[in-house]
Design a protein with these regions (language model features):
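Contiguous, well-folded functional domains in the mature portion of proteins
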Residues: 1-156
């Protein structure tokens, strides 16, 4: 029996990057998961898939969604946003909320983040990637539109 391919949509607009080229070993060495990164250019971050928000960092810069089939998806906004301690990021949901792909999760104050010289490279990761097969990321250097373009796919 063939397992249907699961797809994750772009949680933000911007240009895609290969995870291996992200200038932070936590991400480039896949210590927190496998996927890709997007250099954020939009002020809204959406859910890339259906599921439950299973984790929301206190500093608001990252959240995880657990899908119905147990896959953990992490959206990490920027590389050094943790130093902002939540400033410039407004959560629109909280841990435990059921969300659908495309639901707005965070609102970003891009002018403030840019003024503070925050690196907006934003990893989109499958944390428990060893539980999925055929993980495929869109090619690097592609402009993607928030909520429109599929950026990662896998089978369970």
């Amino acid at each position: 029996m063939t397992t249907p391919k699961q797809q994750l949509i772009a949680p933000m607009s911007g240009k895609t990057m290969d995870l291996a080229t992200v200038p932070d070993p936590v991400f480039s060495e896949k210590l927190t998961g496998d996927g890709l990164a997007i250099v954020a250019e939009s002020d809204t971050v959406i859910a890339p898939c259906d599921g439950v928000i299973s984790l929301f960092f206190d500093t608001k810069h990252a959240f995880a969604i657990t899908t119905d089939d147990g896959v953990q998806i992490l959206v990490h906004v920027g590389l050094d946003t943790v130093i902002m301690n939540g400033e410039g990021i407004t959560p629109l949901h909280q841990r435990g909320d059921q969300v659908k792909a495309g639901d707005p999760i965070l609102k970003l104050d891009l002018p403030l983040l840019q003024k503070r010289k925050i690196n907006l490279i934003s990893p989109l990761l499958i944390v428990n990637y060893e539980t999925v097969r055929n993980l495929t990321a869109i090619a690097p250097d592609q402009l993607v539109t928030c909520g429109t373009d599929t950026v990662l796919s896998y089978t369970k």
